C-alpha cells in the first residue's frame, strides 16, 4: 500500500494534473479591452493591433528596437545623494525607491546609452514612467547632463525619449533645480552644433515639459500622447470650462504648431534615422547587411539517359 500511495499515485497525478500557465501570457489593452498575446504584442512594440493604442514601454525595450541589431552600451550616470531631505509621506522616500527598483529592475527613472542607428552613432536617453512616474529628480538631471557631455565628447547627436509626471516631490527644491541644469545641458549641445531630438511619449507633463522635453531641434511625439504642464482635469477645475476634444494630446499640439511630427512607434526608428542623418548633413542611410538568403533546395541532378543500344542489338533490328 505504501508503494502505491507513495509512488504510483503521485506519478499518475503528475501525468494528469493541470499544467501551470504563466500569468503574463496575455495582456488587456487599456483602451479597447482586446486581449493580446504577449509575443504578438512584443513584436508590435507594445502597440495594440486592434485600436493602435501605444502602451508604455521600458527604456531597454525601446533601445532594443531603436539601435542597430538591438546592440547598445550604457553610459554611466553619477549617483546623487540619497534622500537629502529625509522626506516622508505615507512611506519614507528610501522605501519608495526600493519598491520602484524591485518593480522595474532599474536603479532610477532614466537610462542613457550609446550605439548606432542606421550606422549613425548616437547617444540616447529614455525615461521610465513605471519608476515613480518617471519623475525628474537629481538622478535624472545627472543622466541628462551625462548624456549631453557624452554626445559633445563624441560629437554625436542626442535623442531623448521623455515620459514623466513632472518633478519628484520627495526631493523638493532639489528636483526643481534640475530644470535649469538640464536646460544648460541642452545648450551645450546647441553650442557644439549637435542635433538634439526629443520624442515625447505618453505622458510628458509638469516640469519636464517646461524644461528639456520641449527644447529639441526636432520635436516628435507618439500618437495620442498627453503633453502638458498642468493636466486637463486641473485646468477644467480651475477655469470651470469644458476643454476641446483632444486638448493637450499630440495631434492637437501638432495642429497648433507645437510639434514637428507625430509618428507611429513602428515607424519611429526609420524616421529618426532620416532626421538624424539630415541634420548631420549625411546622405541617406545605407541598408545594413541583410541576413544570408535561405539556401536553395538542392535540385537533384538530371539522370543521364541510358545509352541507346546498337542497331543490331535492338529488337527487330535487321528484319525486313
UniProtKB/Swiss-Prot annotation:
Compartments (UniProt record): Cytoplasm
InterPro entries: AcCoA_carboxyl_beta (IPR034733), Acetyl_CoA_COase_Trfase_b_su (IPR000438), ClpP/crotonase-like_dom_sf (IPR029045), COA_CT_N (IPR011762), Znf-ACC (IPR041010)
CoA carboxyltransferase N-terminal domain boundaries: 25-294
Reactions performed catalytically: N(6)-carboxybiotinyl-L-lysyl-[protein] + acetyl-CoA = N(6)-biotinyl-L-lysyl-[protein] + malonyl-CoA
Cofactor(s) this protein requires: Zn(2+)
Zinc-finger ranges (C4-type): 29-51
This protein's UniProt keywords: ATP-binding, Cytoplasm, Fatty acid biosynthesis, Fatty acid metabolism, Lipid biosynthesis, Lipid metabolism, Metal-binding, Nucleotide-binding, Transferase, Zinc, Zinc-finger
Superkingdom field: Bacteria
GO terms classed as biological process: fatty acid biosynthetic process; malonyl-CoA biosynthetic process
Pathway terms, separated by semicolons: Lipid metabolism; malonyl-CoA biosynthesis; malonyl-CoA from acetyl-CoA: step 1/1
Gene Ontology terms: cellular component: acetate CoA-transferase complex
Record region (Disordered): 290-320
Binding site for Zn(2+): 29, 32, 48, 51
E.C. numbers: 2.1.3.15
Quaternary structure and interacting proteins, as annotated: Acetyl-CoA carboxylase is a heterohexamer composed of biotin carboxyl carrier protein (AccB), biotin carboxylase (AccC) and two subunits each of ACCase subunit alpha (AccA) and ACCase subunit beta (AccD).
Similarity remark: Belongs to the AccD/PCCB family.
Record-given protein name: Acetyl-coenzyme A carboxylase carboxyl transferase subunit beta
Organism listed in the record: Dinoroseobacter shibae (strain DSM 16493 / NCIMB 14021 / DFL 12)
Amino acid at each position: 500500500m505504501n508503494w502505491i500511495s507513495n509512488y504510483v499515485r503521485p506519478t499518475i497525478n503528475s501525468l494528469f494534473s493541470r499544467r501551470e500557465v504563466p500569468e503574463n501570457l496575455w495582456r488587456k489593452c487599456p483602451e479597447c479591452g482586446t486581449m493580446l498575446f504577449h509575443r504578438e504584442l512584443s513584436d508590435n512594440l507594445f502597440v495594440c493591433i486592434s485600436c493602435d493604442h501605444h502602451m508604455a514601454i521600458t527604456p531597454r525595450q525601446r533601445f532594443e528596437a531603436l539601435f542597430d541589431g538591438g546592440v547598445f552600451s550604457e553610459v554611466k550616470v553619477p549617483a546623487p545623494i540619497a534622500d537629502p531631505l529625509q522626506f516622508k509621506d505615507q512611506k519614507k522616500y528610501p522605501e519608495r525607491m526600493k519598491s520602484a527598483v524591485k518593480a522595474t529592475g532599474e536603479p532610477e527613472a532614466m537610462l542613457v546609452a550609446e550605439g548606432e542607428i542606421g550606422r549613425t552613432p548616437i547617444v540616447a536617453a529614455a525615461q521610465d514612467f513605471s519608476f515613480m512616474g518617471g519623475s525628474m529628480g537629481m538622478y535624472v538631471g545627472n543622466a541628462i547632463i551625462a548624456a549631453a557631455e557624452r554626445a559633445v565628447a563624441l560629437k554625436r547627436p542626442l535623442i531623448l525619449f521623455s515620459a514623466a509626471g513632472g518633478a519628484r516631490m520627495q526631493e523638493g527644491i532639489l528636483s526643481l533645480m534640475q530644470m535649469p541644469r538640464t536646460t544648460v545641458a541642452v545648450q551645450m549641445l546647441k553650442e557644439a552644433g549637435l542635433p538634439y531630438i526629443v520624442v515625447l511619449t505618453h505622458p510628458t507633463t509638469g516640469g519636464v515639459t517646461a524644461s528639456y522635453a520641449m527644447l529639441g531641434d526636432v520635436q516628435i511625439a507618439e500618437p495620442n500622447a498627453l503633453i502638458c504642464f498642468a493636466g486637463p482635469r486641473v485646468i477644467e477645475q480651475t477655469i470651470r470650462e469644458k476643454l476641446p476634444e483632444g486638448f493637450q494630446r499630440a495631434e492637437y499640439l501638432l495642429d497648433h504648431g507645437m510639434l514637428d511630427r507625430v509618428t507611429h512607434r513602428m515607424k519611429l526608428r526609420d524616421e529618426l534615422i532620416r532626421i538624424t542623418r539630415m541634420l548631420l548633413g549625411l546622405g541617406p542611410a545605407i541598408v545594413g547587411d541583410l541576413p544570408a538568403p535561405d539556401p536553395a533546395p538542392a535540385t537533384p541532378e538530371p539522370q543521364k539517359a541510358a545509352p541507346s543500344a546498337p542497331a543490331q542489338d535492338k529488337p527487330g533490328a535487321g528484319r525486313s
